[in-house]
């Protein structure tokens, strides 16, 4: 898959802000960032309130996703350009959602909000309202989603890529240092997992490293390109960024994101765990 199939540059984005059938969507870890200024015409998706089921621990289902995108004015045949802060951390998470529910034309803004601001490009504070559509999501494509039993069965047979920080991987902490630390019952990592922090795939300006640099990064960490791969982190957002790199940029086959990640796995009774680096 060519990079142009899944990424757009900030130059392209600024030239296509008002292009027909093109919708810019901001998704941030800091859900208030959009309100301080956003790309002109972009709509907001809140990863906490829009993409998560309000009762059970799971994503919104196809019906809920259809309702959400219809209300945001996104149609099935629109080109969706996703972007956000922190090297597209949650924008990649949303990209994976869109692919899970079968949206055909979705891309990331390479570098996200960080690159846009480094370029000194304009932000808008205007409220964005688009005409409502009748979006219809497909049934979820679980070929890109891993569940806990599959993850346990993958130990010793598939690539397991832990994309958290070295301190999370080794068991020193349970979550990124700026977040609460009571997210799971036990620290550590899945036995046999390799540790490639998600952020190593990005340059200083938030853009993705070259395919050659990315391939070298994972090969040197011990990833076997002939095997199936499951990526995980704490709640599935950082690992969706790695899923994007491996499947969409490098073209690996059979790559899955384990969105239950460590907050599920680290609380399972009897699940094998390793500590240390």
From Swiss-Prot:
<feature type="cross-link" description="Isoglutamyl lysine isopeptide (Lys-Gln) (interchain with Q-Cter in protein Pup)">
    <location>
        <position position="67"/>
    </location>
</feature>
<feature type="domain" description="Rhodanese 1">
    <location>
        <begin position="18"/>
        <end position="125"/>
    </location>
</feature>
<dbReference type="InterPro" id="IPR036873">
    <property type="entry name" value="Rhodanese-like_dom_sf"/>
</dbReference>
<feature type="active site" description="Cysteine persulfide intermediate">
    <location>
        <position position="233"/>
    </location>
</feature>
<protein>
    <recommendedName>
        <fullName>Putative thiosulfate sulfurtransferase</fullName>
        <ecNumber>2.8.1.1</ecNumber>
    </recommendedName>
</protein>
<comment type="function">
    <text>May be a sulfotransferase involved in the formation of thiosulfate.</text>
</comment>
<keyword id="KW-1017">Isopeptide bond</keyword>
<feature type="domain" description="Rhodanese 2">
    <location>
        <begin position="154"/>
        <end position="274"/>
    </location>
</feature>
<keyword id="KW-0832">Ubl conjugation</keyword>
<keyword id="KW-0808">Transferase</keyword>
<dbReference type="Pfam" id="PF00581">
    <property type="entry name" value="Rhodanese"/>
</dbReference>
<feature type="binding site">
    <location>
        <position position="238"/>
    </location>
    <ligand>
        <name>substrate</name>
    </ligand>
</feature>
<dbReference type="InterPro" id="IPR001763">
    <property type="entry name" value="Rhodanese-like_dom"/>
</dbReference>
<dbReference type="InterPro" id="IPR001307">
    <property type="entry name" value="Thiosulphate_STrfase_CS"/>
</dbReference>
<dbReference type="InterPro" id="IPR051126">
    <property type="entry name" value="Thiosulfate_sulfurtransferase"/>
</dbReference>
<dbReference type="GO" id="GO:0004792">
    <property type="term" value="F:thiosulfate-cyanide sulfurtransferase activity"/>
</dbReference>
<keyword id="KW-0677">Repeat</keyword>
